[in-house]
């Protein structure tokens, strides 16, 4: 773990997460706040169109930034994704901690910038997540769990290096998963599925009402996604003890599929 801490590539990855998170939050939440501006009285027809625009903004920004910095940091841009990859034994504990810190600080910085730019907006929530009227904490938690589960499941499947059937754009697939989560959750919770993004808005607005939902829900969803993918859908035959070593060493071994039958159980072995 100490050796990873000393590597320039490690710190470049942390900086990439920080900068990409600033761009992600600024673009995504900025698109949502734009609906409050009476620019030439240009208002959309209804809430449904608003939801589609915001969902696409969040999804496309993730896809764009994943393509931009994915080769540097992996472009997690979400503590729930980072936790999922940690539990999947693909990153070290040190990297996970530093990524989550970078993501949270980046979200705060981006939201602070937005606060200055949109200071004239009345009742400016800065995209703060909150439960919709009639939605209780249990329901909101369930929505956040499901929305994050499908996202982290998509990340695990799309980045699985054992697969030989992958085609198209991985970043786009993940971005569409983010958009899908927003189409589901916006009307219930404002759609968190990203604790750092929720944290930034709560910090700047000094409002932490029901904020725990937007950490606990995504973390449970991310953990469930790992359980489902790594132990049920695509089990790994490599020794769990060896995989857990990644938590301290930060080294991920390359694996290949064992067997040509696409319907057979996925097996892994070091190259």
Curated annotation (Swiss-Prot):
Return the InterPro entries for the record.
Answer: Aquaporin-like (IPR023271), Aquaporin_1 (IPR023274), Aquaporin_transptr (IPR034294), MIP (IPR000425), MIP_CS (IPR022357)
Task: Please tell me where this protein is predominantly located.
Answer: membrane
Write out the annotated subcellular location: Cell membrane
Query: Which regions span the lipid bilayer?
Result: 12-29, 49-67, 93-111, 136-155, 166-183, 209-226
Which is an annotated Pfam family here? MIP
Q: Which reaction does it catalyse?
A: H2O(in) = H2O(out); nitric oxide(out) = nitric oxide(in); CO2(out) = CO2(in); glycerol(in) = glycerol(out)
- Could you mention a single GO BP entry for this protein? corticotropin secretion
Q: Where is the PTM Phosphotyrosine found along the chain?
A: 255
Instruction: Indicate where the modification Phosphoserine is found in the sequence.
Output: 249, 264
What positions carry the motif NPA 2? Answer: 194-196
Intramembrane parts occur at: 71-84, 189-201
Residues annotated as glycosylated: 42
Q: Which stretches are Extracellular in the membrane topology?
A: 30-48, 112-135, 184-188, 202-208
Q: Which GO terms describe its molecular function?
A: ammonium channel activity; carbon dioxide transmembrane transporter activity; ephrin receptor binding; glycerol transmembrane transporter activity; hydrogen peroxide channel activity; identical protein binding; intracellularly cGMP-activated cation channel activity; nitric oxide transmembrane transporter activity
Ranges in the Cytoplasmic compartment?
Answer: 1-11, 68-70, 85-92, 156-165, 227-271
Q: Specify the protein's topology with respect to the membrane.
A: Multi-pass membrane protein
For domains, the record's comment is:
Aquaporins contain two tandem repeats each containing three membrane-spanning domains and a pore-forming loop with the signature motif Asn-Pro-Ala (NPA).
Functional summary from the UniProt entry: Forms a water channel that facilitates the transport of water across cell membranes, playing a crucial role in water homeostasis in various tissues. Could also be permeable to small solutes including hydrogen peroxide, glycerol and gases such as amonnia (NH3), nitric oxide (NO) and carbon dioxide (CO2). Recruited to the ankyrin-1 complex, a multiprotein complex of the erythrocyte membrane, it could be part of a CO2 metabolon, linking facilitated diffusion of CO2 across the membrane, anion exchange of Cl(-)/HCO3(-) and interconversion of dissolved CO2 and carbonic acid in the cytosol.
- Return the similarity comment: Belongs to the MIP/aquaporin (TC 1.A.8) family.
Q: How does it assemble?
A: Homotetramer; each monomer provides an independent water pore. Component of the ankyrin-1 complex in the erythrocyte, composed of ANK1, RHCE, RHAG, SLC4A1, EPB42, GYPA, GYPB and AQP1. Interacts with EPHB2; involved in endolymph production in the inner ear. Identified in a complex with STOM. Interacts (via the N-terminal) with ANK1 (via ANK 1-5 repeats). Interacts (via the C-terminal) with EPB42.
Q: What is this protein called?
A: Aquaporin-1
Question: Native species of this protein?
Answer: Canis lupus familiaris (Dog)
Task: Specify the taxonomic lineage.
Answer: Eukaryota, Metazoa, Chordata, Craniata, Vertebrata
């Amino acid at each position: 773990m100490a050796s990873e801490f000393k590597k320039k590539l490690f710190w470049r990855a942390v900086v990439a997460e920080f900068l990409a998170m600033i761009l992600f939050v600024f673009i995504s939440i900025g698109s949502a706040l734009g609906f409050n501006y009476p620019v030439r009285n240009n208002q959309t027809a209804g809430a449904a169109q608003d939801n589609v625009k915001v969902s696409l903004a969040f999804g496309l920004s993730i896809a764009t930034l994943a393509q931009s910095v994915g080769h540097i940091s992996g472009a997690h841009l979400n503590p729930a994704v980072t936790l999922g990859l940690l539990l999947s034994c693909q990153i070290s504990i040190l990297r996970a901690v530093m990524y989550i810190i970078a993501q949270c600080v980046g979200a705060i910085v981006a939201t602070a910038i937005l606060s200055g730019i949109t200071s004239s907006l009345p009742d400016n929530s800065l995209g703060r997540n909150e439960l919709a009227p009639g939605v209780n904490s249990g329901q909101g938690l369930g929505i956040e769990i499901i929305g994050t589960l499908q996202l982290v499941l998509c990340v695990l499947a799309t980045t699985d290096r054992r697969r030989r059937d992958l085609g198209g754009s991985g970043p786009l697939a993940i971005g569409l998963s983010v958009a899908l989560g927003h189409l589901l959750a916006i009307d219930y919770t404002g759609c968190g599925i990203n604790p750092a993004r929720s944290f930034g808005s709560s910090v700047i607005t000094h409002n932490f009402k029901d904020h725990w939902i937007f950490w606990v829900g995504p973390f449970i969803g991310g953990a469930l996604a790992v359980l489902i993918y790594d132990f049920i859908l695509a089990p790994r035959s490599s020794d769990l003890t060896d995989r857990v070593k990644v938590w301290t060493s930060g080294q991920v071994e390359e694996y290949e599929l064992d067997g040509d039958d696409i319907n057979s159980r996925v097996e892994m072995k070091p190259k």
